[in-house]
């Protein structure tokens, strides 16, 4: 069931969070250029900040959907050590999976490039395997698509950390079909925009026009990604609330 929400409040929070992370990360890395520890610290801090902003939006979407920016940001009051711990563990697990898939995919591409004479190896290594790994990563991510909504809704639970993670996974498994449909719909839109813009650029012969089109393309794609990601989060919150109250969509 679709519910009303205040798009402008969520959009402003996303922008504020993005700018905050960008400035903070650049400040930290500027203090110690090529310093692994500082870069790691920057990633850690920006990751925590991102989680706080996303948690605020998620909590607002299940408690005060039509609230102002301040109402959404006040949702940080529901953050506690257990919520942060669970969020941190899930984020680390997803990051490890993403890194493992990226690394293995890169190795496959490298091996394929090193053996271009074998067309079957090239196709599997350079094209098929990276796509398969990406799909696996996205499938795993879908099982935890409702983690922030669950944490915001059960911030005061007496369950242990691993028990909470288990319940989040079970909910993700139960809602997998709905999550997949929403993902295909709202991730497919940016992909179609991307493909359309890329194809249109192929028709342009003038180099100056190509530069102009490229700038328009980048801006248009970023705006599309921003809007669709917000709508996708809102639709996920609808699915979560429907599941919570036993509403059949």
Where are these regions (language model features)?
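Membrane-interface segments at transmembrane-helix boundaries
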Residues: 1-5, 47-124, 145-176, 232-249
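Polar low-complexity intrinsically disordered regions enriched in Ser/Thr and small residues
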Residues: 11-12, 20-21, 35, 128, ...
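Membrane-interface segments at the starts/ends of alpha-helical transmembrane spans
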Residues: 32-42, 113-133, 207-220
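Short, intrinsically disordered/low-complexity patches at protein termini
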Residues: 33, 94, 106-110, 195, ...
């Amino acid at each position: 069931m679709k519910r009303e929400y205040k798009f402008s409040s969520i959009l402003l929070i996303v922008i504020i969070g993005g700018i905050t992370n960008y400035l903070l990360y650049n400040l930290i890395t500027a203090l110690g250029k090529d310093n692994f520890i500082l870069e790691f610290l920057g990633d850690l801090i920006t990751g925590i900040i991102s989680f706080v902003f996303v948690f605020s939006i998620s909590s607002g979407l299940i408690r005060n959907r039509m609230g102002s920016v301040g109402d959404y940001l006040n949702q940080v009051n529901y953050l506690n050590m257990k919520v942060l711990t669970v969020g941190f563990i899930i984020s680390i697990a997803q990051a490890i999976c993403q890194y493992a898939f990226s690394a293995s995919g890169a190795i496959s591409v490298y091996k394929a490039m090193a053996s271009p004479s074998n067309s079957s190896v090239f196709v599997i290594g350079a094209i098929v395997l990276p796509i398969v790994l990406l799909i696996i990563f996205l499938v795993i991510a879908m099982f935890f698509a409702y983690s922030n909504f669950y944490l915001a809704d059960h911030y005061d639970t007496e369950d242990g950390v691993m028990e909470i993670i288990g319940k989040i996974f079970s909910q993700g498994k139960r809602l997998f079909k709905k999550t997949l449909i929403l993902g295909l719909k709202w991730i497919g839109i940016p992909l179609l925009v991307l493909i359309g813009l890329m194809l249109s650029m192929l028709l342009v012969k003038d180099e100056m026009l190509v530069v102009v089109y490229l700038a328009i393309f980048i801006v248009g794609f970023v705006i599309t990604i921003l809007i669709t990601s917000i709508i996708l989060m809102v639709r996920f919150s609808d699915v979560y609330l429907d599941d919570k109250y036993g509403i059949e969509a």
